[in-house]
Amino acid sequence: MGIFFPILRFSLYLCTMKLRIFNPEHDLALAANLKQFTAPHAGRQLRSDLAFIPALWAEEGDLVLVDDIDFAKNRVRHFGAELNSKVEFITKPQLKHLLKTEFLDSVHPWGWNLSLKGELERLGIPEIMLPTDAVLNKVREVSSRQWAALHLQRGVEYVTETARVKELILQYGKAVVKAPWSSSGRGVKYVSAEDFRTAGDYPTFERWVANMIYHQGGVTVEPLYNKVRDFAMEFEMKDGKALYRGLSLFDTIKNAYSGNVLCSEAEKVEMMKPLISEAQLAGIRQRIIEVMEPALKDIYSGPFGVDMMICTKGEKDEFCEAVLNQEGEDVNRTGLGVVPCIEINLRRTMGHVAINLYEHLVANSSDEMKTNRTNIMRVEYDGNRYHLRIKPGRPSEEAPLH
């Protein structure tokens, strides 16, 4: 008995349809750099459970790739019944069958990597619709922490010898050592000079460094800052231009993403004012555009983000920019600094999702939402499945998001 393929509601308009894909294992796939890569179970389950979320930013008539159509429809209805009529959910077997007779306009994944290209080739996506291997290699290069260290960061060194790693840790006292490519806190190690004096677990760490250098070519080493607040700026490359899309106020637990504030851009700027001025944020934003636009204009189209940090600024924190007051003066009254680039995410981010979700809720909700009510967007795991949830409330000083 053959597979039954229902007629798609938008089949007559496939020439203008886009295929949307949520592939959150992207960062791990970049590290592996293989045509066929199998993500860990947690990554595969996250992709399956939240496969519906491109519906939040998709355009009318777009296809969204999912494992289970009924499951996706049930999940997305919690964010508005209109989403089920806006997009068409489609499984891999259905897509493979469809591509025998129809053409898509374009493909828009969470992030582009060699593994995803191989997956789409096997489904029958024409080569002309996919990035070349040369372009993917360049995207991978710009996605690396080595590239960020060279182009957007201060006080971050790319190191290819374990002895130099030890020198920098002794210089900084406390440091963060990172693999060039990793995901959700994996490939990130915190170490202090005290570990050398007490022996501690340093031999294990040294083996980890040697392994990263062997497999990925090197590691980055940077000072460990005393974090006050995580935040990010979200952008999109469109027609060769880097466009600012908004602030992302997010939180992490054990270096893994846990949630985002859902509110207007004006409210987010207001929340940040006790920590950093709007003018200084604008200056940082412009510097990022000036660096990223020429780097990406010929190789990448789509969303990207830059993670940042507000920290306490001590005398030794020479690489942390002083936070300026509202008049743009460095009076050193706050004792705060800003690290304007912790990571570059050359893909869609949960910050983009939060911006899109807020816009959708405002456009399709009651007057209460439109009067600047703040909510929190969370990704939660209940022991069985991952869930995207909206919870009422706003961050506080004691608990920014949790």
Predicted regions and their residues:
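N-terminal-proximal low-complexity accessory segments that begin disordered
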Residues: 18-56
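Short, positively charged and aromatic/hydrophobic N-terminal segments
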Residues: 3, 7-16
